[in-house]
């Protein structure tokens, strides 16, 4: 399902313009990553897709249908949503957390729980965790449950709002690799928000670098942005001048590899997006 922003502006009650005349098409069955520093408007963009935030002006469409014409509750039930810190219901078991949205959508509890068990397998969690509560899980396990819940209604669109920002670097790498695998297997339209350009390049087919007010500094594939940063701001943001953390592209027989200055592989780019993990 293609998502399109058409001249969208969001002005909050205090006068802050979070999004200023934003227009962009987010291609279907691809991962689009909004990346930028805190306060640039990336999360506001994401939350307007499922109408948690309403635009002040402009229009957002899904497959050319304005989302403002749809019931917001029904819209949200058809869009997966994964948050930082998972946002799990503390008094529900893992199984019931995952099964919640399908049950609310009219699926029988038995069917929803059966599907929830399948999703635990898909996101790499042992079924033995199904009867545990969120407080009994590690941070990484909670995030995997959050991803499973986001996929529970088999949505065409999955929104991911800095989902790995609160876990340690090792777990974060594992979750990033798992996200690449899931997208390859499930073929969803994914919108991912992060402040980390390395994460954006690892996960994104289309990367959107944002400045304040959600103004687009550059949009393109990771390789396009790395090879041809549009402005000095983009060049600095993507790490061209970051010493040991600088990123570069390396051609190999297996494709184009994203490496840091120490030669460590950060991802594999094939075509316009990530096809393999770390």
Where are these regions (language model features)?
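A short, proline-enriched helix->beta-strand linker immediately N-terminal to the Walker B motif
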Residues: 152-156
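Short coil-to-helix segment of the ABC ATPase nucleotide-binding domain corresponding to the Q-loop/switch region
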Residues: 92-99
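ABC ATPase NBD coupling module
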Residues: 66-80, 104, 109-110
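Helix-to-loop junction immediately C-terminal to a conserved catalytic motif
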Residues: 50
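Conserved ABC ATPase signature
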Residues: 133-137, 141-143
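Hydrophobic anchor residue at the start of the ABC signature
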Residues: 147
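Conserved ABC ATPase "signature" region
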Residues: 103, 110-128
